Amino acid sequence: MQSKKKWGLAITLAMVMLVSTACNSTNGGASSNEATSTSGNGSTPASAKTITLGFSQVGAESGWRSANTKSIQDSAKEAGYDLKFSDAQQKQENQIKALRSFIQQKVTVIAFSPVVESGWDTVLKEAKDAGIPVILTDRAVDSPDKTLYKTFIGSDFVEEGRKAGQWLNDKYKDTQEEVNIVELQGTTGSAPANDRQEGFMELIASNSKLKVIASQSGDFTRAKGKEVMQAFLKAHKKIDVLYAHNDDMALGAIQAIEAAGLKPGVDITIISVDAVKDGMQAAADGKINFIVECNPLLGPQLMEAVQSVVDGKDIEPRIVTDETTFTSEQAKEALPTREY
């Protein structure tokens, strides 16, 4: 009996030592990992946790916007981020409501593409006070306080307008007749609408023969582009050029031009911005003469910026995307391998 008791005690002690060793080994492993990924106070940094990204999109008004949304959703999934997505349906009040919801949910980072440029200071200050960094994508905000956001990722819209104006200048540099231009603007008050107009007007100002005879918002939609172009055609007997701030408005305008018995790209020269697939197809078909690219695939750059902000790294206040331009012939060549 004494022998059995000794064996029982020995087995019990062995088991206790084994469990103790296993627990110490587990804790030791965690401590080792924390040494390379935690801050000095021993807490786990945000980069080691699941990053929650609150993103408020303008809407789904165009093919460009759809491609932009998909790029962000796919990139967030690939990065392993928890994406909270909100569609503002092109209304600033919806977007402000979404940003405040993100603040209440205590997301890690907020990113959004502003519907319009102004009116953001109050909600951005709320995010700053809550310690939530903000990243702007595609569109900028008009605010004197640049500390309200970490960076702005997107195109140089003024430069896009300049490219459109430069091409038109070159096309009509030797003309002796007045060239009547109509302009389909984007959403009133939005950064791309303001800037694309500014850059375009800056470049054509050097040619006194180039005259903008009408300019109206088509709200970046195909339906509105068609509607406004119909009004232009009724109001003006001679239209030589259409400058559209995006492909969808240009495509709507093409429908109106064809319905009026005219040939788009021949009777009326058409310049557009975006270079999405439908626009590129129209260019390849000769219906759009010149397209300035605006790259919607901002997802990878956004996720990289989010990670840098979370890790406390320095980040450029302005990140400009690389873009090009397409004539009809160049669009025809590029179309088969076009990603969007």
Provide a role label for each language-model segment.
Residues K6-M15:
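Sec-dependent N-terminal signal peptides
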Residues M15-M17, M249:
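Methionine-biased hydrophobic packing positions in alpha-helices, especially
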Residues L18-A22:
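C-terminal motif of bacterial Sec signal peptides marking the signal peptidase cleavage site
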